């Protein structure tokens, strides 16, 4: 039996394939374990994806969308003069992964496909993802969906010495490119149950990039304020190319600071190149990383647990590599968090270890008027099965839906400061804290 699991992330997509009882392995696309989740509109009907989309973006940035998943609520994307449904953009990403999997299977299609999704995604957002998958013939035969933290917990439990026996619990801290998500997952005799989950829709690796770009802008923009304004609001193709190059260099500097105490950042002319230190970056992002750790702590409490009773705190998502993340969690919880293998691949690999009928989402059973984190462990006798066959109508509604909002964690700017800033590509403008009562939980 051929099983393909796909973790379609905000910035990167990871696929894992297992065949004939062999251990699951990452499907390399274009020679890499991760494929950019980017799309480029090449004419009215053709969508390029992955690294080819990134390459073409250098020629015409207006036709490029680096993070289509982040725009799942918008219905459609304007790429140059082409209007592309978000469902079709996601389908293009899934199609490229499926093509590579079929090639590696010698032309055969997977017998089963598992798609992971954020635990807080409701029925409408899941319908967008599943509708995209149904547009890809190679994925439609036996399509299942499961929450990302459940897959992460299964990955944790698959390692020797890291078992999660029935009754055991694990906290999952997932800092991806687009959002921060956390959950407490409990092991049952049949599989796993999500005991509590929460997150921050305004915190992810892209927001860390934004904070660093703002910081650099405050340092160098005085050299030519008019030119810097054109970087913020491009007026020409050359301006858009310069803006994209700056974004890439800022991201590379952020990643380098996870390994080194300082990093050089090439700046477009006429601005001088900049040097940024890990200490500077940590000062910029510490307040918001502290927010994420407090959300995790509140989620553990909502599950009726204490940190000392957990089997561990598991770090997933590429941005969890930032050293300050582990430091703050250790200070708050008194335990050193665990990161196994590449955090980018943990969810896709873990999806293979989840029993087909062994997932429950406790939060789905909470009445709309109640708080999302009130149900205790153990699970009810007949829990809602979240790992389920996907029967989404490919034409399901894909229009806007409410953004996530937590009554105790209102949105805040990532840097905590004001100044020149690059627009966050693909994210609606931030307008500060809002009344949580006016923004229900996502469907």
Whereabouts are the PLM-identified features?
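Acidic, glycine/GT-rich loop-and beta-edge segments that sit at the periphery of enzyme/chaperone cores
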Residues: 10, 223-229, 346-349, 353-443
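Conserved A3 ("GATE") glycine/threonine-rich loop of ANL adenylate-forming enzymes
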Residues: 8-12, 36, 148-153, 178-179, ...
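Phosphate-binding loop and its immediate beta->loop->alpha context
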Residues: 16-137, 142-147, 210-255, 261-263, ...
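Gly/charged contiguous loops adjacent to phosphate- or pyrophosphate-bearing nucleotide/cofactor binding elements
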Residues: 59, 206-330
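Conserved NTP-handling cores and scaffolds of large molecular machines
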Residues: 43, 72-76, 98-101, 105, ...
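Conserved phosphate-binding catalytic cores of ATP/NTP-utilizing and phosphoryl-transfer enzymes
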Residues: 144-173, 302, 348-360
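Gly/Thr-rich phosphate-binding beta-strand-loop-beta motif of the actin/hexokinase/Hsp70
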Residues: 1-25, 159-195, 250
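Conserved phosphate-binding/catalytic loops in two-lobed NTP-binding clefts
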Residues: 138-148, 326-352
